[in-house]
């Protein structure tokens, strides 16, 4: 037998500023299943994580709540830890980036980069809040859009017209924190020389460390040229002060990934068998894997490996990227009851049902995963209760009643047990490749065969026939052995079911290797229900509990519309005459391509077909469409005669039309079926 592998695994660090929701849980469940599989196979697999506990947002929320940042992150960590534990996510260590280990390692890495010439400084001009005595990030500045005059817009992008601009272009700027008028000030910032690692990154990202789709996206960024990365923030800031630079702090994304190392170092202090340098030192032969979402690929596939390389540390063996979660085919929505917190789910349903559903849908790619609540109920009830647990419930009673709970030594269908045995390597390969969906399909196919065998032999009918009790015992003993095999294959996904099954089977904790043997002349414990069907009423109750309160009344002035409708929130604009309207050329447009804009928080770049020509349009709809490829092939409406506007990212040749207040609530408009690209909208 080969030596056990030594593997260190991490998930992205949850931000210590809010609750965990089911979108977050997708990643932690995915990672936990892979880690449990490795341990199931006998490998030494360590799973560490931490709360991402630094940044202005945490500092400001703590101030608003009248507590210290340290109190806030301690409260959030307790909440996160409970959610993870109750979802059966089993970390070897869950730490915090606000720790002595992280301070020490962040300083060490920074000094190594600085001493190697990879840190530069230059002056940056930013808005400064004179009341709060702090520099303002773009999201903390609001004012009037310089393009369309919409009020209350962010410092870099207008959510109403989609325009982008520098914060200094904003009219009547105000601090979103204090309401004060900001002033421009210069400040020394520190930059990591990312372009110096261009050749290294081009090689590393094509060395098998990334999925092909991710490597291709990274190649686009590399081909467009890397920029120096600003790694500093000015006081006041909740984080670590940069060594030898009073009043200057590490940007949260500098010390956040170092939190992986810090959590492991904290564990090493309690585990003498673990050697920190064996996992993080240059040339380490152990394996290191990061599981992340596709929204933070640039930090993990560009900045992080470059930092490690520059600091003379090892780089990851692999970065495993997953897609976003949708619910019922749409982005999670509070108003629809599909923005579901982890705790809200746990208040209504067992964790293993969601673990199995995620496993049944998770492939090895970066495609988004949809949690369809009707399909969720059907799949769990059909697969787990109707197939897997059903085998044990069908057979256990006959063994207890007819043979005092002792399984006879008999293999009533060798070809069936051989099929289970020969399927194991393929299921293991699927787990290893993170193709959980294939592992579940192949396991359920075996469950179907086991159920078909039991249905064919019908022990309930045999038991009524004189002299056929030995057959009943042989059939049911085989059924229990096949159930045991299925539990072994499902244990990384369903650890509680496995533990309950082990008690019923009266066996030690099952390992993967146990699939090669059968129980014979073995005493079972009394059987009790291992799982119950999902009642759709509980799913409905969960959705109801997730809905935000939409019944608040509006207290606007008498001239405002009554109630809390859209006109109350966004009153009608001043009237225009028909000629003004007729001057607007509205056209049907086909979205040929939709993609993220590097460096822009809110923009998507759309390539539009309007009949005889193509247009390039930048639109501030990214928050509502985080997976822009979903828009490709869709018809929309655009203002085609809007004067082209030069933007920081290129020329925008028009404006697409959308409704909604902004953020996640943006809805791109589409014409009725039958409309063709280029047709005028009248």
Swiss-Prot record:
Its EC number is 6.1.1.10. Its main location: cytoplasm. GO terms for molecular function: ATP binding; metal ion binding; methionine-tRNA ligase activity; tRNA binding. A motif ('KMSKS' region) lies at residues 331-335. SUPFAM superfamilies: Anticodon-binding domain of a subclass of class I aminoacyl-tRNA synthetases, Methionyl-tRNA synthetase (MetRS), Zn-domain, Nucleic acid-binding proteins, Nucleotidylyl transferase. It comes from the Bacteria. ATP binds at residue 334. It is an enzyme of class 6 (ligase). Is required not only for elongation of protein synthesis but also for the initiation of all mRNA translation through initiator tRNA(fMet) aminoacylation. PANTHER family: METHIONINE--TRNA LIGASE, METHIONINE--TRNA LIGASE, CYTOPLASMIC. Belongs to the class-I aminoacyl-tRNA synthetase family. MetG type 1 subfamily. This is Methionine--tRNA ligase. It comes from Pseudomonas syringae pv. syringae (strain B728a).
């Amino acid at each position: 037998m080969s030596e056990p592998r030594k593997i260190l695994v991490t998930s992205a660090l949850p931000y210590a500023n809010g609750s965990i929701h089911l979108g977050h849980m997708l990643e932690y469940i995915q990672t936990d299943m892979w880690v449990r599989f490795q341990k199931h196979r006998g490998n030494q697999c360590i799973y560490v994580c931490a709360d991402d506990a630094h940044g202005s947002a945490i500092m400001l929320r703590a101030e608003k709540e009248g507590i210290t940042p340290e109190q806030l992150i301690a409260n959030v960590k307790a909440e996160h830890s409970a959610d993870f534990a109750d979802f059966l996510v089993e970390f070897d260590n869950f730490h915090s980036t606000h720790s002595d280990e992280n301070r020490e390692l962040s300083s060490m890495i920074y000094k190594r980069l600085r001493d190697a010439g990879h840190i530069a400084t230059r002056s940056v001009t930013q808005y400064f809040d004179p009341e709060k005595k702090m520099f303002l990030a773009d999201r903390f500045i609001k004012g009037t859009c310089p393009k369309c005059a919409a009020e209350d817009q962010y410092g870099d992008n207008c959510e109403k017209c989609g325009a982008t601009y520098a914060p200094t272009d904003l009219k009547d700027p105000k601090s979103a924190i204090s309401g004060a008028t900001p002033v421009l000030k210069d400040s020394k910032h520190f930059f990591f020389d990312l372009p110096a690692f261009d050749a290294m990154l081009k090689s590393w990202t094509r060395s098998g460390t990334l999925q092909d789709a991710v490597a291709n996206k990274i190649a686009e960024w590399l081909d467009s040229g890397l920029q120096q990365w600003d790694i500093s923030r000015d006081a006041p800031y909740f984080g670590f002060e940069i060594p030898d630079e009073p009043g200057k702090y590490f940007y949260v994304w500098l010390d956040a990934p170092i939190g992986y190392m810090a959590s492991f170092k904290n564990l090493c202090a309690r585990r003498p068998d673990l050697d920190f340098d064996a996992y993080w030192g240059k040339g380490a032969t152990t394996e290191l894997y990061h599981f992340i979402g596709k929204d933070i690929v640039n930090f993990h596939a560009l900045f992080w490996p470059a930092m490690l390389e520059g600091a003379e540390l090892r780089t990851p063996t692999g970065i495993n990227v997953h897609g976003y979660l949708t619910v019922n085919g749409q982005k999670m929505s509070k108003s629809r009851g599909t923005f579901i917190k982890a705790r809200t789910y746990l208040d209504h349903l067992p964790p293993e049902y969601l673990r199995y559903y995620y496993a049944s849908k998770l492939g090895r790619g970066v495609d988004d995963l949809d949690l369809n609540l009707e399909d969720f109920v059907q799949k769990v009830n059909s697969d787990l209760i109707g197939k897997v647990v059903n085998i044990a419930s069908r057979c256990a009673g006959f063994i207890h009643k007819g043979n005092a709970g002792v399984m006879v030594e008999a293999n009533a269908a060798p070809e069936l047990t051989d099929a289970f045995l020969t399927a194991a390597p393929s299921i293991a390969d699927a787990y290893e490749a993170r193709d959980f969906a294939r592992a579940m399909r192949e396991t359920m196919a075996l469950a179907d065969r086991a159920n078909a065998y039991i249905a064919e032999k019908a022990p309930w009918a045999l038991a009524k026939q004189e002299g056929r009790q030995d057959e009943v015992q042989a059939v049911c003993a085989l059924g229990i052995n096949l159930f045991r095999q299925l539990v072994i294959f499902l244990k990384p996904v369903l650890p509680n079911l496995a533990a309950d099954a082990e008690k019923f089977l009266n066996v030690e904790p099952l390992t993967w290797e146990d699939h090669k043997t059968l129980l014979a002349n073995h005493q079972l414990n009394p059987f009790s229900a291992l799982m119950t069907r999902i009642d759709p009423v509980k799913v409905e109750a969960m959705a109801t509990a997730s809905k935000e309160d939409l019944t608040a009344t509006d207290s606007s002035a008498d001239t405002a519309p009554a109630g809390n409708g859209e006109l109350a929130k966004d009153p009608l604009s001043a009237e225009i005459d028909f000629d003004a309207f007729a001057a607007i050329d509205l056209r049907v447009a086909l979205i040929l391509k939709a993609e993220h804009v590097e460096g822009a928080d809110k923009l998507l770049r759309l390539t539009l077909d309007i009949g005889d020509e193509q247009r390039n349009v930048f639109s501030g709809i990214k928050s509502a469409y985080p997976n822009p490829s979903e828009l490709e092939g869709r018809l929309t409406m655009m203002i085609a005669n809007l004067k082209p506007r030069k933007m920081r990212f290129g020329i925008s040749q028009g404006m697409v039309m959308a409704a909604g207040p902004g953020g996640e609530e943006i809805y791109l408009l589409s014409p009725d079926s039958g409309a063709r690209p280029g047709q005028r909208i009248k």
